[in-house]
Amino acid sequence: MAKILKFVFAIILFFSLFLLSMEAEPLLPCETDGDCPLKPIIETTPMISLHYMCIDKECVLFREVLQTP
């Protein structure tokens, strides 16, 4: 009985990880920084700035912590 429960748990875990990986955001192709989205969908605090940059022909999201004067 315990072996069956462990097997079912492993199958559920495997399928949940598979479904999560299917929903992951794919990398966006680009040539320059202008080809990347201007604003990310993620909301941040005023002290953190998020922006995309084109690196190796893919848009990559960067986080920048702003300094207070």
Swiss-Prot record:
GO molecular function: metal ion binding
UniProt keyword annotations, A-Z: Metal-binding, Nodulation, Signal
GO biological process: nodulation
InterPro entries with a match to the protein in the record: Nodulin_late_dom
Highest taxon in the source lineage: Eukaryota
First and last residue of the signal peptide: 1-24
Disulfide feature: none
Other comment: Contains 4 cysteines arranged in two pairs in such a way that they might be capable of binding a metal ion.
Protein name: Nodulin-3
Provenance organism: Pisum sativum (Garden pea)
Gene: ENOD3
